[in-house]
């Protein structure tokens, strides 16, 4: 998918990886970049607008934990304005295993609900044109950081959901792929809580090993968007981009 002249919705497009990715997207010249985020950041929006004045950048406040009906109402406002949307990026995420319910609500349920809501506008069974979904998951969906089992499990769930979405594309007309960053230098990983304090130094220990910058991750994210490969499980780690093969251990045969 060429980003140029496309309409893109980016949930959590002002976060660590999110904001650098928004910058890279804007440089690629979409027609519209609609950012949905919990907290407004006028300076960040102004920066994006200045980066490429030809791109229309808009912001709507959005908390992914709201009911599906509320998300659908917001999306209707956006679709009424833009008429078409080509790509939805689900990027909301928190890393704090003290907050068990919220971790699951943001990292998994929020992704499911936002996706469910946009199907009202995209699903070809309802006369929709189809669309593309990029879900930001995590390498912890492959192998957990066991000191943060709630976070890791929430990302594994989001990855499984995304893989299923891709398989459903012939029915819905909506394709999907996952973006799975490795350890990336953002405020998210500088300090966070392990489950039941099993490892108080978990953030410090992780950062003792090689990491990548959010810019490196963002640049590879844009490459994945342009590749537009349904069902791809993209690993974005140490400044590299790799489509991994998922090992199948069981099949439902349906």
Swiss-Prot record:
Q: What EC identifiers does the entry list?
A: 1.1.1.1
Substrates-to-products reaction catalysed: a primary alcohol + NAD(+) = an aldehyde + NADH + H(+); a secondary alcohol + NAD(+) = a ketone + NADH + H(+)
Keywords of the record, alphabetical order, are: NAD, Oxidoreductase
Active-site annotation:
151
Pfam families, A to Z: adh_short
Sequence positions that bind substrate: 138
Instruction: Write down the SUPFAM superfamilies for this protein, in alphabetical order.
Output: NAD(P)-binding Rossmann-fold domains
Q: Which GO terms describe its cellular component?
A: cytoplasm
| Homology family | Belongs to the short-chain dehydrogenases/reductases (SDR) family.
Oligomeric state and partners?
A: Homodimer.
Q: PANTHER family, from UniProt?
A: 15-HYDROXYPROSTAGLANDIN DEHYDROGENASE [NAD(+)], ALCOHOL DEHYDROGENASE-RELATED
Q: Which GO terms describe its molecular function?
A: alcohol dehydrogenase (NAD+) activity
The leader peptide range reads none
What PROSITE patterns does the annotation carry? ADH_SHORT (PS00061)
Which positions are annotated as binding NAD(+)? 10-33
Q: Any one Gene Ontology biological process term?
A: alcohol metabolic process
For this protein, the record's InterPro entries field holds: ADH_Drosophila-type, NAD(P)-bd_dom_sf, Sc_DH/Rdtase_CS, SDR_fam
Please identify the protein, giving its name as recorded.
Alcohol dehydrogenase 1
